[in-house]
Amino acid sequence: AAFYVGVVTNAAFASIFAANEQRVLRDVRDHEVVHRDFFAAVLGSARIPNLTPNFSSVNFGDRNSVLETARTFEDLGVSAYNGAARYIANLTYLGIAGKIVSVEARHAAAIRDLLAPRTGSFAPKAFDDANSPQTVLNAADPFIVENITAINT
């Protein structure tokens, strides 16, 4: 959520993205904020506390830098939900996770289409990755100041 908030509030946003692209990125931001707030409410004190993002590697004034980073986050999100499903014992929460991962997959496809319109890159594989929590955290590490380790999975 923090990444997309940064994208849409950046001074260059309106100049580097066409109107239809701005709409997509605002929608993705809105979805990610809902997901973040949902997890904060459901997990309560068991959630990962607020993290300090490190977006120093992202040039928010460059369309490709923003979209490449967005693709990284969306693909990582899909792999995180897919990998975490086996740890979710509560069927209600598993169903909700399934609903969220389907939205994340649409985000990934939309971002990929912005990068390479009307090509096969929107869904490059028949099956998405399913990564372990530690693999996901390792991939996210460059974008987070705090050190996070998966325990009790």
Predicted region positions:
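All-alpha RGS (Regulator of G-protein Signaling) helical domain and cognate RGS-like helical scaffolds
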Residues: 1-153
